[in-house]
From Swiss-Prot:
Name of protein: Sulfate adenylyltransferase
GO biological process, one term: hydrogen sulfide biosynthetic process
Gene name per UniProt: sat
GO terms for MF: ATP binding; sulfate adenylyltransferase (ATP) activity
NCBIfam families: PRK04149.1 (NF003166), sopT (TIGR00339)
Gene3D superfamilies recorded: HUPs, Sulfate adenylyltransferase
Keywords: ATP-binding, Nucleotide-binding, Nucleotidyltransferase, Transferase
Pfam families listed in its UniProt record: ATP-sulfurylase, PUA_2
Pathway participation: Sulfur metabolism; hydrogen sulfide biosynthesis; sulfite from sulfate: step 1/3
Amino acid sequence: MSNLIPPHGGKGLVCCLLEGAELEAEKKKAATLPKLNISSRAKGDLIMMGIGGFSPLDGFMTKADWKGVCEDFLLADGTFWPIPVTLDASADDAAKINVGDEIALFDPEREEFMATMKVTEKYEMTEADKIFECEKVFMGEGTPTAEEFWKIAKDDHPGVQMVMNQGEFNLAGPVKVLSEAEYPEEYPGIYQRPAESRAIFEERGWKEIAAMQLRNPMHRSHEYLCKIAIEVCDGCFIHSLIGNLKPGDIPADVRVKCIDALVKNYFVEDKAVQGGYPLDMRYAGPREGLLHATFRQNYGCSRMIIGRDHAGVGDFYGMFEAQTIFDKIPTPEGEGKALLCTPLKIDWTFYCYKCDGMASLRTCPHAKEDRVLLSGTMLRKMLSEGGELPDHFGRDEVVAILREYYEGLTEKVEVKLHGAATGN
């Protein structure tokens, strides 16, 4: 029997990815079915459903699921889930699809069939529905009223833009996943299925694992957070987003090299595991933090490191709103229905010259002038402009990799700073 935290949902790992003869037969069948082109976001969602990362989901959400998740963080069956996982279709495409149809979900970028789907429901998403979803999922302490939110959200919030630009209908139903796309080949050993990360943790004898979410290269604060986690847990799972990012973000392969260099040179051997997952960012701030904890539970992690401005977007969210939201979510009764992965809440961290080391607001009594505030956004901005980094911002091995990347770019990358990145 496993010592690890059970997957979310009480059904074990729900994996929709076909293999062997069944996979080959379904691929042939997909070529004969009506084809629906899907977005990069839907592709990532399908892969996560395929490998069990989104357990207990086995398909795209019904309207009851969508509404329950938006309003109450609950699927229709009462299981906790923080963010809608839906498949949109244009009015023209939806008109050709009826409830009961089987369709093939096609990735136009790779020209590959990603899944087949049995359509169990087709529901309209009016502009009012999209506004409802945006206000429920994306509003935060930085814009506490709808009026304040919509003043800037349509232009400045990528998650809102994504939802408002979706098709006029959503399609729901179970899926059979046919591919993991480019991830196994491009990121061997980094891209992992939940069953694989669980096997690694079991082999090491770990029970309590903290997950570290990354979409920026690791700087000293990231390193410090991971080492705090290692002090109180058996190990740390450094888990990077390797799906689509915002323009100006550093590519996954460069970030992987940075993590490798840092772990090799500054971590005790066998206390950290690096992994990657195939989702796109949803830019949902605190709710995205909950999603990170939910699927990390499926990967075998019992704790989720939540620091300052986790999954933040500009100034839409409070600095620690992604921590406090864990205290407000429902805890439904029934096996597997509640979220079991708990937050490891850590205050704002920085390098302090007077402390002569890394510290946090909880441990350092010194003035702002004595501190080097660290953020991934600021790191990218300084390097993209060819500037010198302050001492103690990043490890030399990591900075060398990043400088080489930026020096090789043919076009300058503009990086904008917001309050979270500047310390304001």
